[in-house]
Structure formats: structure tokens, C-alpha cells
Amino acid sequence: MVLAALIAGMASTAGMAAAADEPAPTFSEAITQSAHRAEWKRMISGETRVPGWLASENRVSSPYRREQIEGASYLVGWMCKPHDCAANQFYGVIDEDAHRMWGMLVTLPETPGAYDAPSKYASFRWFGKPDERMKAYLRDQLKQDPNWK
């Protein structure tokens, strides 16, 4: 009996350790899941000149996280263009209940000084028609980047 409990405890601990070693799902993975794929496609299909890295699945991404914004739960995350993250970033928000998605594309020109003071050179593009509250939230996410000056 004691041996069975010990084995069960070891198996449980091993299972938790294996789960802890698995990488967290990324925002890029979240938007390709069947639950969110239609919202993502709807959001970018209404736009013109969507950057190739954003329209394809060729992007670098952070793990998504669940956040409360004014009492509602959202999935939030970040993606960027491979090998050019500093100049091409996308911050996104998924509202799972309303089946909506919003995003902010931040790009920097190839101008001397742009990487040293990105806030002076950056251009912003909104996806999904976010309201002012959501735009402010997305801007706040960008300001948390330690390289954003």
C-alpha cells in the first residue's frame, strides 16, 4: 500500500516536471488555433498591405498570457518579424467571449537613430478597429518594453 502511494506520488511529480518543461503556448500559436483562426483571418483580411511576416506563420512570438482589462478576461501577446524584431512588432489582444481581436503594428524606418530612440520614429497601424480604451492598453504594452525610449 505504501509502495503504491510512493509510486503514484513519483509519477505525479514526474508528470508535473514534464509539464513545467514544456514551453508555454505563444501568441502566434494562439491565433492559429481553431478557436481563434477565424477572428485572425477576419481581422487581417480587412486590411491592405499586411506585411508578409504578419500574414504568414513566419514570425517570432512571446508566450501569451491571460489579463483582466476593465473586468473582462483577454489573451494578450506579442509577435515580431524574424531577424528584425526591433523594427517590426505586433501587439495583440483576443476577446474570447466576443470572438474579436485587435492589434497594433509598430514599425521603425531604416533611419539613423531610429533604434536608439524608437518612440520618435515609430509608426503605428491599428488592426481590428480597436476603441480608444484598447488602443491605450496596446500602447501601454509597448511602453513596458525596456528598449522603448
Residue ranges and their predicted role:
Residues 97-114:
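Intrinsically disordered, low-complexity regulatory segments enriched in Ser/Thr/Pro
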Residues 76-82, 104-105:
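Short beta-strand segments that buttress and anchor functional surface loops
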Residues 20-38, 110-149:
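C-terminal partner/receptor-binding element of secreted or periplasmic proteins
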Residues 84-91:
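Short, surface-exposed coil-to-beta transition loops
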Residues 18-78, 146-148:
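N-terminal secretory signal peptides
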Residues 2-13:
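Bacterial N-terminal signal peptides
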Residues 67-70, 94-99:
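A short, structured loop/turn motif at beta-sheet edges
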